[in-house]
Amino acid sequence: MRFIEEFINKGYFHQCTDLDRLTAITKETKIAAYIGFDCTATSLHIGSLMQIMILRLLQQHGHKPIVIIGGGTSKIGDPTWKDEVRKILSKEDIAKNAEGIKKSLSKFIKFGDGKSDAIMLDNAEWLDSFNYLDFLRDFGSYFSVNRMLTMDSVKLRLEREQHLSFLEFNYMLLQAYDFYYLSKHYNCSLQLGGSDQWGNIVMGADLIRKISGKEVFGMTTPLLTTSSGAKMGKTAAGAVWLNEDLLSPYDYYQYWRNCEDADIVRFAKLYSEFTQEELNRFESLAAEDINAAKKQLAYELTKLCHSEQAAKSALETAVKIFEEGQIDENLPTVVLEQEVLQAGISAYELFHEAGLATSKSEARKLIRGNGAKINDRLVADENMIINTNFLLDKKVIKLSAGKKRHILVRV
């Protein structure tokens, strides 16, 4: 199966500047294509997983993936579909975040000097040295303000009478220049991104065409939500991070294990590397087979992101907890100072400290709703004092929020 065919078959396709021509070119030759990522955290989360799998697919078909870290543009902020001005990051924050993002990406693609090896670039390399007057002189005449005002991302802010600074308005010019720079210096002929980036991508392709006459393309992916309408990458407990220092492989496994029934087939197509035969089986699941399919999906996605050993460990932990009722040492762990436990801490405070509730009031609500357990026993009193007497084997306390979120408290 060719790149574009598989791209469409997996559900990645939304829009392309010239799909027929791009299909023909990618059949005949290998291209360089780029995707940009925000540099706003020390890890990517599953909201970026489709873009990451596209980079992986490019590489598998012999094309060269280029990853752009927006070290330059992160200093400004992208107004695309944002209701508020974004926090501007320091150089130190950007450098730390870029390191973590490369760690996320390296789980899925190979970086190096080979023809199809990925490279990662920071657009600060060319944007930081920009002379504003030179930019206006050399590129300003190629951009139409009339057209920029028609971009949906800008129109949204204006229609809501929300503040749109000149700083943010310039973002689309800089993204267009990124594409031009990569086309000129890295022979990049394709920019990929979410459908909310369509306007910015087209502006870049137009800029290249006007200046150099090169044939380049833009292609976008659909914006994904779960079947219930929730945004991919976010849960009530926080983001589903790819790096294990922010989210344990067990919690990553549990996210996919607990996905909604209606999402199983779509997630399998988008995020796994199951064969077509396996995908066909997913599409014809009987009701009694859904749980087994979720386990298989969670295992495969955890293996892909972390390792086969991590997937096995997560599966074993889940079996011990949910099927055998045991405590497993591989559960996510938080450390509590021994002095705190010796003095005693109220149940609601402990659940908040352990991260099973985002606030103390939420912890109280959890306990009042009979959703909290300590060492598998229901917590009836939110003010109950938890001390060293609750330690199992003098080592840990098991906390549970609902049926699927568990954590060990160690001292």
Swiss-Prot record:
It catalyses: tRNA(Tyr) + L-tyrosine + ATP = L-tyrosyl-tRNA(Tyr) + AMP + diphosphate + H(+). PROSITE patterns: S4. ATP binds at residue 234. L-tyrosine binds at residues 34, 171, 175. Keywords: Aminoacyl-tRNA synthetase, ATP-binding, Cytoplasm, Ligase, Nucleotide-binding, Protein biosynthesis, RNA-binding. A motif ('HIGH' region) lies at residues 39-48. One of its GO terms (biological process) is tyrosyl-tRNA aminoacylation. Belongs to the class-I aminoacyl-tRNA synthetase family. TyrS type 1 subfamily. This is Tyrosine--tRNA ligase. It comes from Rickettsia peacockii (strain Rustic).
